[in-house]
């Protein structure tokens, strides 16, 4: 699926869902994230750093997350235009990549 505003990382793979609803998680999954409004701009970079550090500590270089920003709220209106608080593109990305923050 192509996206107009969302940039898919080149160095990762999708998490997929099996018919029994279990997950196939690759070593380098792409995880969509919303920065959010309010304190999101302050806590999102720290959250990513903490998660990245925990993964590195547990798995070394064998596993990592490729973060993919998707948009909602005020930031979405700046990227997509007025009244685009939750763009369809964001919903599609969460559907396609199965897991997000």
Model regions and ranges:
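Metallocofactor- and cofactor-centric catalytic cores in central/energy metabolism, strongly enriched
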Residues: 1-101
């Amino acid at each position: 699926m192509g996206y107009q505003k969302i940039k898919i990382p080149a160095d990762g793979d999708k998490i997929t869902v099996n018919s029994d609803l279990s997950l196939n998680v690759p070593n380098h999954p792409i995880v969509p994230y919303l920065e959010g409004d309010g304190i999101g701009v302050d806590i999102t970079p720290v959250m990513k750093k903490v998660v990245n550090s925990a993964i590195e500590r547990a798995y070394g270089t064998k596993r990592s997350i490729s973060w993919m920003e998707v948009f909602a709220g005020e930031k979405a209106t700046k990227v997509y235009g007025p009244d685009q608080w939750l763009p369809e593109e964001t919903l599609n990305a969460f559907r396609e990549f199965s897991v997000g923050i």
